[in-house]
């Protein structure tokens, strides 16, 4: 009997969609699910044909966090530490991936699922989406989710989420800065593809450099940040993508031709 894959991948015009595929368990991040995502991300990092990644969930939810049954079944300290290190590696990989990652969110995104949304570079949600760092309700402060959440939300809003575990709707998530856009459920596919297509139309080399700089400089003091940004600009100017883009502007062409880059 063929086993249903935990992660689905589809590729179209430089856009890769990864879909968490355990709908009967609300796409929980079991060890096996995280291993599947990690393998896919590692492969994508080396795939120059991929310009944008979309991360989605199958079924009624985006992701309901970790698999609590699996955690309780193997709750010794060594296993728990390994689980959260595995999760942390996956989250860091999302940030270090050369390609931008867009979370496509519907239904609930709770605990590590909310972390996943926060860790992605961009996020678009349907208006039926809900978000929570809900571990506090079962006696677990969402420590690893807090790393991503506190880097996306203002301090007071982040603390409210982390200390109450209460759900917020998509509108409030937008106001908090957790997501970029809210749309009707029937428009979610189009909204995500529209954003992905805009990004995919740009040159991948300078997008990758820009993403790397974005995350690196925000952890630095202002002088070091400007120094790194200056070097990135110099490197960017030497790319053929920049030469084509600037020449297209000077030639008054509608768009640069980055199709073969």
Which residues fall in each region the model found?
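Amphipathic alpha-helical segments at domain termini/boundaries
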Residues: 1-21, 25, 167-200, 208-220, ...
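Conserved CoA-thioester-binding segment of acyl-CoA-metabolizing enzymes
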Residues: 1-58, 92
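A general structural signal for well-ordered alpha-helical segments in protein cores
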Residues: 13, 68, 80, 87, ...
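Terminal peptide-recognition signature
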Residues: 18, 22, 37, 55, ...
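Charged catalytic carboxylate motif
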Residues: 32, 36, 86, 93, ...
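Glycine- (often His-adjacent) and acidic-residue-rich active-site loop
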Residues: 35, 46-49, 57-90, 109, ...
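Crotonase-fold acyl-CoA enzyme core
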Residues: 92-205, 239, 244
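Helix-loop "lid/cap" segments that line or gate small-molecule binding pockets
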Residues: 161-162, 213, 231-237
């Amino acid at each position: 009997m063929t086993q249903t894959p935990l992660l689905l991948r589809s590729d179209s015009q430089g856009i890769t969609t990864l879909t968490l595929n355990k709908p009967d368990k609300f796409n929980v991040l079991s060890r096996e699910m995280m291993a599947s995502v990690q393998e896919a991300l590692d492969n994508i990092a080396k795939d120059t044909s991929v310009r944008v990644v979309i991360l989605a969930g199958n079924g009624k939810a985006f992701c309901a966090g970790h698999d609590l049954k699996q955690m309780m079944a193997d709750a010794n300290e060594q296993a728990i530490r390994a689980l959260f290190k595995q999760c942390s590696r996956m989250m860091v990989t999302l940030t270090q991936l050369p390609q931008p990652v867009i979370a496509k969110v519907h239904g609930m995104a709770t605990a590590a699922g909310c972390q996943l949304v926060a860790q992605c570079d961009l996020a678009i949600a349907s208006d039926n989406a809900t978000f929570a760092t809900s571990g506090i309700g079962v006696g677990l402060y969402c420590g690893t989710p807090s790393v991503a959440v506190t880097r996306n939300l203002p301090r007071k809003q982040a603390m409210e989420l982390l200390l109450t575990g209460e759900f917020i709707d998509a509108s409030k998530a937008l106001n908090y800065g957790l997501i970029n856009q809210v749309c009707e459920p029937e428009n979610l596919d189009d909204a995500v593809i529209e954003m992905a297509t805009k990004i995919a139309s740009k040159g991948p080399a300078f997008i990758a450099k820009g993403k790397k700089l974005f995350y690196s400089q925000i952890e630095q003091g202002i002088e070091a940040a400007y120094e790194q940004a200056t070097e990135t600009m110099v490197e960017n100017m030497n790319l053929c993508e920049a030469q084509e883009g600037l020449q297209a502007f000077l030639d008054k062409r509608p768009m640069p031709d980055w199709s073969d880059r």
